[in-house]
C-alpha cells in the first residue's frame, strides 16, 4: 500500500461514526453499567460501571455516575476485561520483500545477498503497517485489541512495534498517549530488536546455509555493531546503526528460541554482548526456568501448539517424542509462573486469531491459574512491551481497550459480546 493510500485510509477510519452514536459529537462517551468488572490491576468489582470517552477510560468502580448522553450498555450477566494483547503477530504488517540476487556469480555477490537478507536491524514494523488489513480486523473480532507487530524472516530481523488492531476517532487525543505521531495505530516503537534462526535462510549456496551458520552470522553481526560503535572512519550502515541501542542496553533483544537448547544459546549471546533478553516463540522451558530467572529474561510463550498432522491415518503411530511435545506444550506457562518468570503469549503461526484465546484456555486446563493467564494476556504483555502505563488493565487514564464476555473468559463456552479498541466498538461477525 502506498503512503498516499495509507494516509487516506487513516483519514477515513478516523472520521467514521459508530452505529448508535450519531446523536453525539466526538469524543464519543460509553458506559457499561451493572457488570462484573475485572480490572486486572486490582480487585474484581462484582457490580460496577466503566465509563470511557474519546478512547480513554474515565472511571471504573461500583459507584460511578454515568455522564448525560453516554451510550449505555446494560452489563447485567456480563463481565468486562481489558482487551487481549498478542505479543507476536504479523497481522497488518506489509514488510518489504527480502532482497534476492538472481544467479549470484561471485563471492562478493553471495556476501551481499547474505547481508541484505539476514541483516535488517533497521527494518521498523511501525513503518509498514496497513491499518485496513483484514488480518487486523479479524484479530480485533477475536478480542485481541493490540499486537506486537514483529518482522519476519531470520537473522537480525528488525524492530517490533506495539500497535492497536483498530483506530479510534479522536486521533489527537489518542496520539498524545502514543509514540508515533502519524496516527493512533502505533502505541510504542521500537519495542525490541528481533533475532531469529533457520536451517537455510540465505538460499542457494550462500553462507550461512546451516543452523550453526546462521547462529555464527548473528554473533558476527553484533561484533560488527560493536566495531561500528568504536570505529572513527566507517561507511554508514543503517543496520549497524540500528543495533546501537540494543548494545547500549536501551532496547531489548528478542531471540526466537523454541527449545531449551535454543534458549540457552540465546542467553549465552545476551550475556556475551550484555543485551537485555526476551525469549520469543518459547515452547520447551521446563529445564531452563532457573537460567531465565537468573538472566532476568522475559518470555513470550507460543500458543501455536503442535497438533497431529491431518495427513496421518487415524490409526498411524507417532514417535513418543512428538506425543510428549504435544502434551507438554500447554503446560509450559504454569512452569514459568511457578518460577516467577514474567511471560506473555503470542499467536505467531496460528491461522485463526480465535485460537489465541482457545489455546490460552488450554494453559489454564493444564495447571496455570486463571489470574496468571489473564495477566499474561493483558497487563504482563503490556509491561513486557513497555506500555503498562497505557494499556493492559482497566484503570482511569488508560486507553479504552476492553472486551465484554458472557461468562468467564477461560470457559470454552464463553462468548465475546462486545470489543472496544481505542474506545470504539468493533463490529463482531
Where do the language-model regions lie?
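Hydrophobic faces of well-ordered beta-strands that scaffold small-molecule active sites
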Residues: 85-87, 147, 253-255, 277-279, ...
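Polyanionic/metal-chelating signatures
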Residues: 132-281
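Histidine-rich, glycine-flanked metal-binding segment
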Residues: 28, 37, 41-83, 98
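Divalent metal-coordination and catalytic microenvironments
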Residues: 35, 50, 55, 77, ...
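C-terminal cap of metal-dependent C-N hydrolases
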Residues: 35-38, 48, 383, 395-429
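Bacterial N-terminal signal peptides
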Residues: 7-16
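His/Asp/Glu-enriched, well-ordered alpha-helical/loop segment
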Residues: 96-97, 103-114, 122, 252, ...
